[in-house]
């Protein structure tokens, strides 16, 4: 599934992501835009360390999910393939786990590059939140 920006914003708001970990809803949606283009089936790799990135939030197989290609910390306790379906509830749960680590949203390189310290005040202005 490819979400629209506003569709994803409403979904994430319903899952209490606005303010989660100290990050505004706009930060979460911005991160998803630049990580996956809002596509739940986004799959990328092979990364330099042999890992792959899965789904809407491009969650990494070395740290967050298990893909049977290599050993994993599997901190979200989930098979990576589950992060490629249209149900994003488990993706959201895993993203919440990621942001609890000291790096916070800086775990996502695309967020650092495109969203961090940017003025996102108008980013969701059209979404009727």
Curated annotation (Swiss-Prot):
InterPro entries: Glyco_hydro_22, Glyco_hydro_22_CS, Glyco_hydro_22_lys, Lysozyme-like_dom_sf. Keywords: Antimicrobial, Bacteriolytic enzyme, Calcium, Disulfide bond, Glycosidase, Hydrolase, Metal-binding, Milk protein. Transmembrane segments: none annotated. Its EC number is 3.2.1.17. Ca(2+) binds at residues 82, 85, 87, 90-91. The active site is at 35, 53. Coiled coil: none annotated. It comes from the Eukaryota. Disulfide bonds join 6-127, 30-115, 65-80, 76-94. Residues 1-129 form the C-type lysozyme domain. Binds 1 Ca(2+) ion per subunit. One of its GO terms (biological process) is defense response to bacterium. GO terms for molecular function: lysozyme activity; metal ion binding. Lysozymes have primarily a bacteriolytic function; those in tissues and body fluids are associated with the monocyte-macrophage system and enhance the activity of immunoagents. Belongs to the glycosyl hydrolase 22 family. Monomer. This is Lysozyme C. It comes from Equus asinus (Donkey). The gene is LYZ.
């Amino acid at each position: 599934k490819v979400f629209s920006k506003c569709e994803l914003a409403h979904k994430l708001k319903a899952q209490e992501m606005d303010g989660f970990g100290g990050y505004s809803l706009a930060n979460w949606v911005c991160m998803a835009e630049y990580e996956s283009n809002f596509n739940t089936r986004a799959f990328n790799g092979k990364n330099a360390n042999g890992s792959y990135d899965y789904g809407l939030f491009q969650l990494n197989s070395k740290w967050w999910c298990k893909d049977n290609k290599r050993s994993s910390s599997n901190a979200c306790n989930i098979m990576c393939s589950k992060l490629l379906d249209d149900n994003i509830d488990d993706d959201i749960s895993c993203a919440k786990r990621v942001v609890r680590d000291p790096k916070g949203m800086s775990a996502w390189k695309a967020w650092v590059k495109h969203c961090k310290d940017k003025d996102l005040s108008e980013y969701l202005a059209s979404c009727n939140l």
